[in-house]
């Protein structure tokens, strides 16, 4: 047997029985870049459906591209926004705050550290993480684009 039952899979190669999604949205369009596959897999499991990995499948995934500075900023903003949104959606506002708190404190400390030592690129990365968290906290949609 070349299938393995799992709770979640990465989204770069997924196949679905779309008939099972007639009664609900497929991907949550509020997500952008991160955790949309985790959200979908969690909803599938909550419906007592199965997720399988084909263990001998071969996928040619051309990854590992270098990111421009602006894409790096976008990525960091959306990672933090999506992490908060995912936790809020599935576990509630206070659990989301608890789960993002250390990320927020870490980003603040690193932001000020890189500000003091004049590392502007690194400072901007942590600024974008802070902004992503704040936007999620105040209920703004995942709006940041380049």
Indicate residue ranges for each PLM-predicted region.
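Extended, non-globular alpha-helical segments
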Residues: 2-17, 69-104
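A short, conserved alpha-helix in the catalytic core of glycosyltransferases
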Residues: 2-26, 30-58
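Short, glycine/charged-enriched secondary-structure capping and boundary segments
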Residues: 47, 67-68
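Hydrophobic side chains within alpha-helical segments
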Residues: 31, 39-42, 81, 85-86, ...
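Residue-level signal for well-ordered alpha-helical scaffold segments within enzymatic catalytic domains
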Residues: 19, 23, 43, 85, ...
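Flexible, glycine- and charge-enriched loops at secondary-structure boundaries
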Residues: 31-34, 69-76, 123
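Non-catalytic, C-terminal membrane-associated alpha-helical segments of glycosyltransferases
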Residues: 74-82, 93-146
